[in-house]
Amino acid sequence: MRLPPNDCSLAGTVQQGRDMMFAQLAGVDMAEADFYWAMFHDAVLEGAILARCDLRGATFNSANLRRADLRGANCGLDNLGGSTDFIGADLSGADLRRANIAGADFTGAKLIGADLSDANAVSELPNWRLTWFRGADLTNARLAGARLSGATYDDRTVFPRGFNPNEAGMIRFIGR
């Protein structure tokens, strides 16, 4: 999907179940749109505005969401894993309950106050990419029941008060 020239908004639209595979939507304003069960496989959404979107059940395998604004988005039950790139994205206040985040890269992402309750960062597949939280800010994030075993973090990662990444089975990454 490509928008017509000079059209850079899907804000507030209803796109339920829409096939957005390979869509080129970098920088597009999609705030408060309804993408319930939409497919974003290999989509380019770099810098897109997806704040307060309904993304429940959507799939994002191998999508580029670098620096995307997903503040307050409802991503519950989503498949956000499979090498999806959230580097530098803002997911503050997002609902990621029961989302599959295995293989996603949250390096430098803001997950302040996000709800990752029962989210799954563990893949059952061999040779699967690790889930990265290097330099991510998880201040006040809810992690109850989240399966984070094998996910990586580093010294810059900020966790909620009282959360112990080692007890959750996370791996400390040393290096660049």
Q: Predicted regions: what is each one?
A:
Residues M1-R176:
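Tandem repeat scaffolds
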